[in-house]
Amino acid sequence: MSVLVVNNLQKSFGGNQALKGISFELHSGEMLAMIGPNGAGKSTTFNMLNGQIRPDHGTIDFKGESLLGLSPRQTWQKGVSRTFQIAQTFSSMTLAENVQLALLSAHHQLYAMWQRATHFKRDEAIEFLRLVGLHKDADKACAALAYADVKRLELAIALANEPLLLLMDEPTAGMAPQERNDLMALTRELVRNRQSLANGLAVLFTEHSMDVVFGYADRVLVLAGGELIAQGSPQDVQDNTLVQKVYLGGDQPLFGLGHGA
């Protein structure tokens, strides 16, 4: 079942056409990678999907409903969550409080005083932390976390509204190889655990680390110059001569398959 259907998405900034009519679909239970050189249009696409900017032309349908014109908050409340290259967490709060704040937002109660929020759905927050292996550190300040654990916390926050679509913007940036594999293996496990449920999870992620892309993506989209130049299985994309030329300027193997496949 298609969770997300993007059709003929276009966007220009001044005289620069950042996106030139890209179209793709994302299915429930799928991990879809979006790759491309800097300036290919990946960030522009993500920013349109979660309502940060509006396309000049095209449609974005989520669960059969248009997302056009919705704010990031409205998009989030529809069931679209996003993690960022630079984690969006509150360093002075505990891990549990970070997740509780997301739960408040999911229940349309951000107006509540923080004194109330410290007790609001604490048990539920602990369970989201358990999903990412951080429940034992629930009362630790976020500032005390190692970087890889901050990314896990951000994942727990993103899951707080039980999304059907998770957008992950370079989730493993700045991580060591083992940390990258651990985070993506966790993400894949979360997706698979939700597959049998009515509210299954689909993931769209951008990534520069090709071992992550080829190790964890079910399908891959390749952008270059604002156009979708290739899509398919990791192996199909790896063997695509146009993709090889875009990345390496010649007809040679693109990348070796990564770990975690």
Listing of model-derived features with the role each one plays in the protein:
Residues 2-261:
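Glycine-rich phosphate-binding loops of nucleotide-dependent enzymes
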